[in-house]
């Protein structure tokens, strides 16, 4: 009799990784040359990053690449929650790192549990997302209904994420990461007035990290954009992690469904067009006063109502509408929406 595994790896992590392949991400094994030969101080996949850099900047030399790469490593050590690197990938350095205008010219990869290590301290995100070899996002998953010390898995992960942001040993990894997502593959439940379960995303921050839900308003449209999950891809991943026996288990097949809470969330946030929108227009650095009254740089991510409002305004403008009214509820982020609108629509 085959023993069934019921843990976050089999119930959420593997199904999530396989779902990302539906969205067009290529899977990298931990034993692949790209992962083994990465820059361990930043987790940049050197072979992919170099190839893409020299393709986008075909006038650049090998020496130019080496110089720019060293500049990135130095920038990621700065105490600026990644602001310098953020400006760099938005072409402020004079070089192109991401082709923002033609998404398919970029490469998209995922890998499981790539270690982020500095000295004796380390953490391993469940899934790391690489664009052109740059680890710009990661995803942490929790087992559904896992309660420890009176806390749900989501609440524990939120606290763990905040502690990582405060750890100077992890500065390079924090600064290069643009978006973090967490999920326990459960539907949202706000009945107790707090977000104890579900799927959330955030950007890195010094303090007061804000975790945002994503409640899809275009379900049919985004689901129709998914490609099929092939048996060959399932076999490849399960064999790679030595879990091929899962393939015949009914629960695993259920967790692979594209409409599961975690997978639906990943579609909403990691569909390539959506992710590029968030990375290009949905992140902002602002100076705020901390609890001591000191000015502190913070980073915020666009919330889902602001995203859908921005896209609705765009559709209205395309239809020739010149004026109108945007209705807001209290605390819905009117000022931030105005900023994001101007950045995107100008």
Model regions: which residues?
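ATP-dependent helicase/translocase motor core
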Residues: 2-346
């Amino acid at each position: 009799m085959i023993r069934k595994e019921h843990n976050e790896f089999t119930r959420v992590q593997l199904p999530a990784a396989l779902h990302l392949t539906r969205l067009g991400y290529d899977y990298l094994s931990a034993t692949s040359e790209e992962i083994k030969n990465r820059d361990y101080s930043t987790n940049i996949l050197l072979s992919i990053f170099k190839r893409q850099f020299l393709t986008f900047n075909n006038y650049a030399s090998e020496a130019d690449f080496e110089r720019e790469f060293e500049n990135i490593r130095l920038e990621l050590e700065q105490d600026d929650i990644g602001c310098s690197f953020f400006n760099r990938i938005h072409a402020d350095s004079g070089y192109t790192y991401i082709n923002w205008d033609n998404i398919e010219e970029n490469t998209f990869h995922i890998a499981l549990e790539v270690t982020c290590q500095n000295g004796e301290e380390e953490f391993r995100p469940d899934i790391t997302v690489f664009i052109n070899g740059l680890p710009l996002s990661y995803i942490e998953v929790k087992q559904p209904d896992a309660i420890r010390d009176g806390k749900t898995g989501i609440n524990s992960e939120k606290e763990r994420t905040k502690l990582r942001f405060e750890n100077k040993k992890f500065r390079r990894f924090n600064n290069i990461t643009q978006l973090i997502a967490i999920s326990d593959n459960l539907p949202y439940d706000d009945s107790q007035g707090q977000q104890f379960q579900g799927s959330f995303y955030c950007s890195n921050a010094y303090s007061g990290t804000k975790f945002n839900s994503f409640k899809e308003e275009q379900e049919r449209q985004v689901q129709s954009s998914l490609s099929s999950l092939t048996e060959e891809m399932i076999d490849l991943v399960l064999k790679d992690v030595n879990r091929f026996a899962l393939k015949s288990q009914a629960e695993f097949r259920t967790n692979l469904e594209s409409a599961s809470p975690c997978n639906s969330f990943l579609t909403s946030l990691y569909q390539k067009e959506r992710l590029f929108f968030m990375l290009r227009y949905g992140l902002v650095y602002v100076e705020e006063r901390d609890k001591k009254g000191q000015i502190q740089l913070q980073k915020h991510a666009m919330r889902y109502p602001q995203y859908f409002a921005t896209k609705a305004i765009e559709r209205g403008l395309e239809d020739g509408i010149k004026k109108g009214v945007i209705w807001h509820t209290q605390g819905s982020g009117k000022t931030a929406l105005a900023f994001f609108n101007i950045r995107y629509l100008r």
